[in-house]
């Protein structure tokens, strides 16, 4: 089956839905394709205790606020249900269970092959986001079968793990939240390859994101000197729990994980430990190998763009970290980038 649209949006999570909102507002013939079974599954399938560090007032898309206390912090299930409700409210044409196999361009027309039919479009917005495939270091293969290992993308709760100690490798906010959760009744090690920075969730009774907004930090753009500086820094850990547990000795910090042999894990300071469980909080990587169009990706496989606009006429990206602003990859920030793209789409 072949679908013909003016604009095809690839990705049906927050970036794709924000783009869909503006396309719908402008009466453009479009479709959104997503590989999930249900809208919001990207969030719904994350670990049970996941809570966003952005307050509800900064965790919604254009045209529809997130329900609940605006100063409270939403759970992952709230966000999943919100995205589903959002798509229904604006009657966005979404085709689920549809995974893109290839994107090509022939004679000014984009041709998209999927597992569920083909699409022809004048313009394409790639809104798959940065969290596509879990990254696990190659030396994980050397870990003994007796040690249970799981990436954060497949971790749900402590009951998955076997009895005994845990090493969490990677100290982003997911790794921090999981380490805190596990420290209640386990010996927990946290392997960190950089100096951790801790930001409180609130200052003087207001969310730190209220202060970020007040100071203009959320709108700092990548082309500014401040933006260049911030973008090169590691992300801070939001909240005080991890810091307190480290100080109390309930979570033991180890430097970068260097190698594994059986059940012995070695670190950058030459220390070694043996644990019964390893959680890889080592992040994700983007896979755009299905984009079969020249001059779209750089030598690292990353999109080449200016504010999401590529040099290939009609091809756009949305939902990238630092796409233009500090908040571009956050739910509350993606709408501004979608609005910028709709103006470019309408003018070309």
UniProtKB/Swiss-Prot annotation:
MF (Gene Ontology): flavin adenine dinucleotide binding; monooxygenase activity
SUPFAM superfamilies: FAD/NAD(P)-binding domain
Domain of life: Bacteria
Record key words, sorted: Oxidoreductase
Record-linked Pfam families: Pyr_redox_3
EC class name: oxidoreductase
Family matches, as InterPro entries: Auxin_biosynth/cation_transpt, FAD/NAD-bd_sf
Catalytic activity, EC: 1.-.-.-
PANTHER family in UniProt: FLAVIN-BINDING MONOOXYGENASE-LIKE PROTEIN (AFU_ORTHOLOGUE AFUA_4G09220), FLAVIN-CONTAINING MONOOXYGENASE
Name of the protein in its database record: Uncharacterized oxidoreductase CzcO-like
Species per Swiss-Prot/TrEMBL record: Geobacillus kaustophilus (strain HTA426)
Lineage, broadest ranks: Bacteria, Bacillati, Bacillota, Bacilli, Bacillales
